[in-house]
Amino acid sequence: MNKRVLVKFSGEALAGAEGYGIDTKILDYIAEEIKSLVENGIEVAIVIGGGNIIRGVTAAADGVIKRTSADYMGMLGTVINGVAMQEALEYKGLSARLQTAIKMEQIAEPFIVRKAMRHFEKGRVVIFGAGTGNPYFTTDTGATLRATEIGASMLIKATKVNGVYDKDPMKYPDAQKLETLSYDRALEDQIKVMDDTAIALAKDNKLPIAVTNMNEKGNLLRIVKGDYSKCSIVK
């Protein structure tokens, strides 16, 4: 069994049918899935994107907002999601802490890896917000970095599909699921598991990545217990 994992959710996942903002029903569902991991003795870290609030690349597209500023706006979006997730976890009776890569002490702790490790020892879920704290880096890269820093045995990317495909399954009915694939193939074939920086960082640190459908109840627990039938593994 994987003892410590980091789960990465997209910001869009929180938006639900509206496509923006936060759907509390989805938030509650995710918190319940995380609770099942904690109840099975798993130490859990979470990273959430900010696409339901604002996407840096999109905000900077027409040049009115500089890319660096747009990326910082995106980081703030991830903190909004982190605060919401912390509340949802506590609503379920779990203890949670939000740590951010940009200091904002009134609402979150600054990211300190040793402090995060102490939280795990005390059974707390740790949410990492504000990405890496630097523009031009995605939240996927931030998740990979944090997973490496805390010594996670696996990074789980919770998405809308049950794994990695050779082409977009939403567009191509004949898309083939890849049960396992190497970091090198993901990079060379441009298979969009995560961005190239995140994949390269995972490769350098031998961090396996599981890609699964977050909407199938129990998938996260199956994966941490070693059942990879409902996911794809990049290693």
Swiss-Prot record:
Its EC number is 2.7.4.22. UMP binds at residues 50, 71, 132-139. Signal peptide: none annotated. One of its GO terms (cellular component) is cytosol. It is found in: Cytoplasm. InterPro entries: AceGlu_kinase-like_sf, Asp/Glu/Uridylate_kinase, Uridylate_kinase, Uridylate_kinase_bac. Pfam families: AA_kinase (PF00696). GO terms for biological process: 'de novo' CTP biosynthetic process; UDP biosynthetic process. GO terms for molecular function: ATP binding; UMP kinase activity. Residues 16-21 are annotated as: Involved in allosteric activation by GTP. Catalyzes the reversible phosphorylation of UMP to UDP. PANTHER family: URIDYLATE KINASE, URIDYLATE KINASE PUMPKIN, CHLOROPLASTIC. Belongs to the UMP kinase family. This is Uridylate kinase. It comes from Aliarcobacter butzleri (strain RM4018).
